[in-house]
Amino acid sequence: MSETINTAAQFPSFEKPTVQFNEKGWGPCELPDTFKDVPYQPFSKNDRLGKICDWTNTSNNDKKYQNKYASSFGTGNQYSYYHEEDETTFHLVDTARVQKPPHQRGRFRNMRNSRSGRGRNARGGLNTHGMTTLSGKNVKARDPRHGRGMGKKFGHRGPPPKMRESSVAVRADWASIEEMDFPRLIKLSLPNIKEGVDIVTCGTLEYYDKTYDRINVKNEKPLQKIDRIVHTVTTTDDPVIRRLSKTVGNVFATDAILATIMCSTRSNYSWDIVIEKVGDKIFMDKRDHTEFDLLTVNESSVEPPTDDDSSCNSPRNLAIEATFINHNFSQQVLKTGDQEPKYKFEESNPFISEDEDIQVASVGYRYKKWELGSDIVLVARCEHDGVLQTPSGDSQFMTIKALNEWDSKLANGVEWRQKLDTQRGAVLANELRNNACKLAKWTVQAVLAGSDQLKLGYVSRINPRDHSRHVILGTQQFKPHEFATQINLSMDNAWGILRCIIDLVMKQKDGKYLIMKDPNKPIIRLYDIPDNTFDSDDSDDGEGDDEGFQQVYNYAHNKI
């Protein structure tokens, strides 16, 4: 009897599995439910899960290639341990950086450098007791001014500088003729210019009160508001210059306009001067109703005043305050009164008529001429502010100006009340840094006028927040030529800059031109402008040519 062999019992069965076909890539198309929502993190077997702190990594000082030897494993936080029981005590902390005022910046820099080994007596630092001294090479590497080593900021240069506004908007119909950069102007020189010769002298001067030389910080004196009229007449509105232009000279200007051009390389703010060429004659004018006569404050400072019109420390408000202080100080230090002697020039004040009964400031006008070569004769109106009686009986003419302190903390300046009596040189040096252009202009005006003395007053606010009340803390006097040498002001370079602009305009055709300092670049531009530009439409028809003077300014009534 034959037996039937069951092959199914001897061999295992094979069932064909279901294979998923992924047309868009490789791997399974669907994920099993057991593996869903499981976080994934790249890891290495030598990594510890949930590291609390890792002290094994060495510090890498190579900032540029700090990720060169870094590993991508163990960097996630999917398996890190979190203590979730103290969530109720968790508070958000405001990490916004608080902007410090300028006077507090860098207060603890020396202390921090001492802790980190970079201080004066720290390890590796500069020791004054003869211990360890850095070599010159290492000092240069650590000095941030050299831009290398630890001092380099890696491109972080702080906020961008603020863009200043131009003194006048350049119009589409203006043609640019020439651009003169400051490095080119600084190299100019016109030596051997002789002293100017007097043509006409006008006005009346009062004598200086010597009691103001004894004022100091402990014996301060309040600044008074002097109710006097100060004329700021431009060149073409001056009746004396109109009279002289028919017979003498071919270039006409005022001392303020000449000082602005001569000291242009020290200016940062924008300014402009209108030039009219008529035949072979040039007239330099300032525009009406502008801020040309206002005195700048901290123009050359590292941190100039902020452009906030609502603040009393904005550039324009400080300029008005400085002009107010200057005019009142120049009149207060004089001996006023009908019984006091006065120094009278040949002619009376040309800007007031005989029937006018107004109190005019003490100003003496000198109309002088200079020979600049190549048949160029300059005629300019210069000013004196006072006169001084010497012990020998001679009279010395003075240019009187005032420096003002507004807020030493905001201006990064020196406390005048602390150092003016003991370290006056440090105070003046700080003013030369912050107001280089203004002091240079005053010096040039004193040299052009032929003043024997340049008297500087130090005027400060009674309260830094109150810009309406001031006190006089002291005075100081210089000889203009010696002071020019002290502040590194070259009159040869000043004459060279003026002659360069005159020669440039002389080559042009007759018409109206404008020179303007770029508000954000060290460049002066010359524009050819239409003849009717800046013409005032509100002039009265009944006024004659000799009476069309620019407005007078009574600074005692200016609201600051």
UniProtKB/Swiss-Prot annotation:
Function: mRNA cap-binding component of the eukaryotic translation initiation factor 3 (eIF-3) complex, which is involved in protein synthesis of a specialized repertoire of mRNAs and, together with other initiation factors, stimulates binding of mRNA and methionyl-tRNAi to the 40S ribosome. The eIF-3 complex specifically targets and initiates translation of a subset of mRNAs involved in cell proliferation. In the eIF-3 complex, eif3d specifically recognizes and binds the 7-methylguanosine cap of a subset of mRNAs.
Name of the coding gene: eIF3d1
Single Gene Ontology MF annotation: mRNA cap binding
Entry's free-text remark on domains: The RNA gate region regulates mRNA cap recognition to prevent promiscuous mRNA-binding before assembly of eif3d into the full eukaryotic translation initiation factor 3 (eIF-3) complex.
Family: Belongs to the eIF-3 subunit D family.
RNA gate, as annotated region: 291-305
Phosphothreonine modifications at: T128
InterPro entries linked to this entry: eIF3d (IPR007783)
Gene Ontology terms: cellular component: eukaryotic 43S preinitiation complex; eukaryotic 48S preinitiation complex; eukaryotic translation initiation factor 3 complex; nucleus
Disulfide bonds: none
Chief location category: cytoplasm
GO biological-process terms attached to the record: cap-dependent translational initiation; formation of cytoplasmic translation initiation complex; regulation of translational initiation
Record-given protein name: Eukaryotic translation initiation factor 3 subunit D-1
Organism: Drosophila yakuba (Fruit fly)
Record bears the keyword Cytoplasm: yes
Positions of the UniProt region annotated as Disordered: 98-166
Biased composition (Basic residues): 100-121, 147-156
Highest taxon above the source species: Eukaryota
Keywords linked to the UniProt accession: Cytoplasm, Initiation factor, Phosphoprotein, Protein biosynthesis, RNA-binding
Annotated localization: Cytoplasm
Quaternary structure annotation from Swiss-Prot or TrEMBL: Component of the eukaryotic translation initiation factor 3 (eIF-3) complex. The eIF-3 complex interacts with pix.
